[in-house]
């Protein structure tokens, strides 16, 4: 068997992987809700900053410049506050932005747009970073998220199939103030 590259899977393994998502209402404390709101705002801010930088570069050169990483933004003195945010959430912003630019140039979609505070969904996604010492885990009705010390209480209203690995979590704040946590498991 030859070398395998990142993102490349055996056909048998690809068929064997099943993903299942569950969405539960959550009840974060006031402090947790404040942190989650900051993570949502930082994700929107980074998207808008990446888009502005990309558009400026595209106007100047007429070509798509390489997209900066969240770490490069964290190094700027006026953006040092990004260091306190969930790095995996910011990495997901970069991945989504790269996909949007790719779809724009392939003609599948229009040009990426800026995200306004009250006109886009209040959400961010974070991933599992380490299987041995998971930063993201569900224990009964308590969900441990990165950068949040205490677990968030969920209303687990349906049974979660055993044996799955929690891969990511999308945190959403609805306009009525309720919080939802979408958990993606891989079996």
Model segments located where?
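Nucleic-acid substrate recognition interfaces
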Residues: 1-187
